[in-house]
Amino acid sequence: MAKEGTTVIGVPYYAGQNPYQAGIVPPNAIYGDPLGAPIQQTIYRDTPAPFNCLYCGNTGLTNLRSKPGVAAVVACMMPFMLGFCFLCPSMDCLWNKQHHCPQCGNKVADFEKSDPCLVMDPPQWKQPSFALPA
């Protein structure tokens, strides 16, 4: 029972009237991710955060710069009345944070302490850093 071998061409490919249906890529096709829209939302708190810089395109961790805010001033008034004025610079957890790109130096985000009467934040006390893997 030998079968005769015939050449099979395969499934015929029919192209329609639209050239894009024939496999041509349209000229306005978007390849990859758009550069201006963030893929994920970065939460900027008082620790370095992973980010994508909108100015230079760098990917990495932000550099933090601390600036005294209202919460730091109110918290420093209490020890100052008791004579402990050396505690003012050591209360870094109450200072506002500015996140900067390490490559170009542009400011990426601000994190401000919103409640001047809150000296410590117990629910967020053990919040893990976004920069370190869990």
Swiss-Prot record:
Acts as a membrane anchor, bringing other regulators of programmed cell death (PCD) to the plasma membrane. Negatively regulates hypersensitive cell death. Interacts (via N- and C-terminal) with MIEL1 and LSD1 (via N-terminus). Keywords: Cell membrane, Membrane, Metal-binding, Zinc. Pfam families: zf-LITAF-like. GO terms for cellular component: plasma membrane. The gene is GILP. Zn(2+) binds at C53, C56, C101, C104. Belongs to the CDIP1/LITAF family. It is found in: Cell membrane. The keyword Ubl conjugation does not apply. One of its GO terms (molecular function) is metal ion binding. InterPro entries: LITAF (IPR006629), LITAF_fam (IPR037519). Induction: Up-regulated by Pseudomonas syringae avrRpt2 and fumonisin B1 (FB1). It is a peripheral membrane protein. Residues 68-88 are annotated as: Membrane-binding amphipathic helix. The LITAF domain is stabilized by a bound zinc ion. The LITAF amphipathic helix region (68-90) is necessary for plasma membrane localization. Both N-terminal (1-47) and C-terminal (114-134) domains are sufficient for the interaction with MIEL1 or with the N-terminal domain of LSD1. Residues 33-113 form the LITAF domain. The keyword Flavoprotein does not apply. This is GSH-induced LITAF domain protein. One of its GO terms (biological process) is negative regulation of plant-type hypersensitive response.
